[in-house]
Structures are given as structure tokens and as C-alpha cells.
Amino acid sequence: MRAIYATDLSAASDAAIENETCLDCLERIGVEEIHLLTVVPSNVHAGMPGMDLEERRERGLEAYRSVMEEAGFRVETHIVRGTPYRRINGVAETVRADLAVVGSRGQSPLANRVIGSTARNLARTTVVPLLVNRVEREADEPEVIREHLFQRLLFATDFSENAERAFGAFNYLRHATEEATLVHVQSPKEELELDPQSELDKLADTLGQWDIDTQTVIRDGDPSEEILDVEESVKPTTTLIGSRGRSRLRRLMLGSVSEDVVAGAKGNVYLVPPARTAGYNLL
């Protein structure tokens, strides 16, 4: 597998990239090649006073490259200019990445970028499965909050085609997964022709065949609020969820349950986009 690893060269990015456990988790799910990417915002110029950005970025990426190569990955580096989330998506398509990784928070001293906003924009537009790696928000030397990325997964499903696609990610995530919680939230407006518990049990049976300890949860109420409440309760290392298959413009305007989860989850989030966006099959 091939991954895009987006960094703003902040202390938070240092924490995520230099964490051996996180890198081991990526290796366990099959990642062999990593494309390290940093984006120079369009409004930042090399000639600005006190900013030798190009050289500092190259040094930063080379340091990260050394860490990742030492961990056994093949590594390429990219420095590009533009809007971060757009360029991350563009490079992901160009190199035919299987997933992208981005830190959830991290103020960059180089570009004055808050990577959290990039993560949220990627949640709306990502063209490949996106791992939002949660790092401590307010610390001089931040740490990854839940470093065993895929050890305990929370999978949120509405039994849609896109949720089914997201569940397909277990085909490779299972190699690093020990426990899973499957949650479905029934909303007042929902009219399902199937039995939620029966459907969750079928999914649990599949995971059981892979020796993953699984529990199921059914809630009533607002999907975003209930999923985040379950996340707070069971404390998964990562929440797995599919994004809605709406038009890109509509997603940008309205937001979605998946965006709320990306914004509000305490742990990591793995977001799987619709097939027509991702351009390849997981199942």
C-alpha cells in the first residue's frame, strides 16, 4: 500500500511522524511506501522577511524521511505550493495513494497554518481514505493521544452503500485490530426495512472470523452526538466511518455526520470516501 503523509512541520507533526508505534501500525496494515508532503500556502513567499522556508522545509522533510526509512518504508518527499487540502488531494491522485494521513491539530511556526482546518477540509473532499491522527492540542511537546492506531476500532454504520464500503476497510485494518465496537444510531426520521441488530450481528460475525472481539451498540437520537458519546464511552483508538456520497459542493456547504466526528472525536478517525470519489474498490 502507498500512503500520503501530510505535515506542516510543527511539533504536533513531529509527534505523529516520530512515534514508532504509529509507524508500526501503518506497516501492519500493509503500508510499504510513504509520500511525505508539505504544502507552502499561496500567500507565503520565499522572499518574506525572516523566512527561509524552502531550505527549512527541505531539512524538516529529510529528517522525517530518515525516521521513516529507518522504520523500513520506501519514502518520497514533495514540497508543493497552494491550498493545503487541494494539493494533498492532488498529490494523492497523482501517486495513486491508498490512504492519506494528516495530524488533527498543530500550529506551524513556518507557515502559521493550523493543520486542524486542513483536516476538516480534507474530511469534506478527500479522494482516498483519510486517517486523522489526533495529537495533544495544547502542549509544548505534544504526544499522540492514542498511538495504537487500529487496535480498538469503533465502526459507525447507517447500513448505506458507503457504510458498507467503509466496513470493507477491515480487510486490511484487521491485521492491526484486536477489538471493535459496531454502532448504529436510529434517528426519528429513519425508516429502515431491515433489523439493525440483525445487521450488526452479521458484521460482528465477519469480524469474529478474523478473531476480533466485537460488541454492538444501538442508540436513538442525533447520529453525530450519539457516535461521539459512544466514542467517549468505549475510547477506541480510531473511529471508522464513511463519508456521505453527496456532491462535493453540497458537502462543502452543509457538512455531515462524518465531518462532525472528525471535528469532535477524542481519538483518531479513519474516514472512507464514496467509491466515485476514491476511484477504486476496497471490497
Task: Give the label of every model feature segment.
Residues T38, S104-R105, R134-V135, H184, ...:
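Short secondary-structure boundary segments
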Residues M1-G47, L149-L194, D205-W210:
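Small/aliphatic-rich secondary-structure junction motif
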Residues M1-A15, R124-R165, G264-L283:
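Intrinsically disordered or low-complexity boundary/linker segments at protein termini
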Residues G103-N121, G242-G264, G279:
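Glycine-rich, Arg-bearing micro-motifs that act as flexible, cationic patches
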Residues E93-V144:
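Hydrophobic alpha-helical segments and helix pairs
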Residues R2, T21-G103, Q107:
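Ordered, small/hydrophobic-rich secondary-structure cores
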Residues G50, E54-E62, F167, E193-A204:
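Short, surface-exposed alpha-helical segments at coil->helix boundaries
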Residues E69-A100, E138-D140, Q209-I241, R246-L249, ...:
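Structural beta-alpha unit
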